Amino acid sequence: LDGKSVSDTPLYDLAAMVGSVFQNPKSQFFNVDTDSELAFACENLGYPQEDILQRMDRTISDYHIEDLMGRSVFALSGGEKQKIACASSSVLLPGIMVLDEPSSNLDMSAIDDLRQVLSLWKKQGKTILIAEHRLYYLHDLVDRVLYVKDGEIKQEYTPAEFDSLSDSTRKEM
């Protein structure tokens, strides 16, 4: 990762390079309120308070989550929790984002919000890795589709190649 062996890199260094968003955002929250959750990664790495506040302000603006700040994470909907999870994993400005089934607990409106976040990350030049069963919302965002089975990449597709697969072939995957 960035020319460094991942196994030889301390976890706190990896945290600044790779952001992650889980299937269930509750499982990645370390705090009970949204402000603390957004600040957590920076505080954990010892960033100065002024830097933390600047990063939070930028992230709140970029992710349009002003209305979610100052709230209990327990009072948020699934989509709102996912927005906070995406924002908190972005506050350190990692170049790589890893998402595990990010749409699984979301309704259509929240999936559209997730698409907007993914589009923002793509515009920012981030590498985005997504393990996902719902693929329709990723249609015009992906550069490559990898079919992984039993922990191995079995096939790589361009978006056009993947789109040309029959429904039955996709279902067999």
Annotate each PLM feature.
Residues 1-13:
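ABC ATPase NBD Q-loop/coupling interface
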Residues 50-68:
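Conserved ABC ATPase "signature" region
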Residues 72-76, 80:
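Conserved ABC ATPase signature
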Residues 86-87:
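Hydrophobic anchor residue at the start of the ABC signature
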Residues 97-100:
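Catalytic Walker B motif of ABC-type/P-loop ATPase nucleotide-binding domains
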Residues 132-133:
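H-loop/switch region of ABC-family ATPase nucleotide-binding domains
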Residues 152-173:
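Conserved beta-strand-loop-alpha-helix hinge in the C-terminal portion
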